[in-house]
A protein has these predicted regions:
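N-terminal beta1-alpha1 cap of cysteine-dependent amidohydrolase-like domains
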Residues: 1-177, 186-215, 219-220, 228-265
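An anion-binding catalytic pocket shared by soluble metabolic enzymes
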Residues: 183
Length: 265
C-alpha cells in the first residue's frame, strides 16, 4: 500500500460546519502504471478537489495483488472510500473483487470505473446472485458463462451520451439526466445476465443512446456507483468530474461520521 497524495492537516471536528475540512482516507485499488492515463490523472484530481472544493482526500494505492489480504486483515474497512480504477486485466481478479465486496458490505462509499465497473457486476453476480460460475472474458476468455464479454464495437477512445434514470444516485451525482462521457474499454456486460442482477437489488441506472448499460448503483448503500465510462478523464484534471466530486463528498461525510462516533465513545 503506497501513499498517493499527502493531505494537508485538517480540523477533525465532526460538526456539519467542519465536515468540509475533515480529511478522508481513500483506497485507490488498481495496478498503478504510468501508461494508464486515468492513473496519471489522480494526483491532479486530488489537488483540484482540495483547492477548489475543500474536499481533502488522503489517498493510498493498493495493488490488486495486495487487496485480498488488505480486505481480510480489515485494513480496507478502515477507509472512507474505495475507488477501483481502470487498468484491467488486473494482476489479481480476486483482489479487485475483495475490495468491492468490503465497500459494498461495510457501507463504505465506492466508485468503480471502466474495469472497476466490470468487476463490480462480477462481484455482485457471484456473491449476491449466486452465479458462481460467471466469468470476465478478459480474465478467462474460454469460460462457458461470460458475465463480462467483448463489446461488439470497441469503446476505446469513444465519447458518447449517457442518460441517467430520474431519481437515481447517478442523476444526483451527475447533476443532470444527460451527460457526454469518455470511454477506453472493449468489454461490457452480457445482456442475458442483467435480469438476475436487477432481481437481486442492483439498479442499472444509466444507459447509452442504444440502451446499453453504462452505470450501476446499489440502492440503500450510502454511495455505491460504478460506470463503464471513465469520469476521471474529463477535461484536463483541474475541474473534477461531478461523479468524482460526489465520491469525495461521500468520503468526507463518512470520515466525519466516523470521527463523531469515535468522539462519542
Amino acid at each position: 500500500m503506497t501513499t498517493a497524495h499527502a493531505a494537508a492537516p485538517a480540523d477533525a471536528a465532526p460538526s456539519a460546519s467542519a465536515a468540509r475540512t475533515q480529511v478522508a482516507r481513500i483506497a485507490l485499488v488498481g495496478d498503478r502504471s504510468p501508461h494508464v492515463k486515468s492513473h496519471a490523472r489522480i494526483p491532479l484530481l486530488l489537488d483540484a478537489l482540495a483547492s477548489r472544493d475543500g474536499l481533502v482526500l488522503d489517498a493510498y494505492w493498493i495493488p490488486t495483488s495486495d487487496a485480498a489480504a488488505e480486505a481480510a486483515a480489515g485494513t480496507l474497512a478502515r477507509f472512507d472510500a474505495v475507488w477501483v480504477l481502470p487498468g484491467s486485466p488486473y494482476a489479481s481478479e480476486a483482489g479487485a473483487l475483495a475490495a468491492i465486496r468490503v465497500a459494498r458490505e461495510e457501507g463504505i462509499p465506492f466508485l468503480g470505473t471502466c474495469g472497476g465497473f466490470q468487476h463490480t457486476l462480477l462481484e455482485y453476480a457471484r456473491t449476491v446472485c449466486g452465479l458462481a460460475g460467471v466469468a470476465h472474458a478478459e480474465n478467462d476468455p474460454g469460460a462457458p458463462d461470460l458475465l463480462i464479454a467483448p463489446l461488439a464495437c470497441s469503446l476505446v477512445g469513444h465519447e458518447g451520451v449517457v442518460r441517467a434514470e430520474p431519481g437515481s444516485l447517478a442523476e444526483t451525482a451527475l447533476g443532470a439526466e444527460r451527460s457526454t462521457e469518455h470511454y477506453h474499454c472493449t468489454y461490457g456486460p452480457a445482456p442475458r445476465h442483467l435480469p438476475a442482477l436487477t432481481a437481486h437489488g442492483l439498479r442499472l441506472s444509466g444507459h447509452d443512446e442504444e440502451g446499453q448499460v453504462r452505470i450501476a448503483e446499489l440502492p440503500g448503500h450510502p454511495f455505491f456507483l460504478a460506470t463503464l465510462f471513465q469520469p476521471e478523464l474529463q477535461g484536463d484534471g483541474t475541474r473534477p468530474h461531478p461523479i468524482v466530486r460526489a465520491l469525495a463528498v461521500a468520503a468526507v461525510a463518512h470520515a466525519a461520521a466516523r470521527a463523531a462516533g469515535v468522539a462519542a465513545e
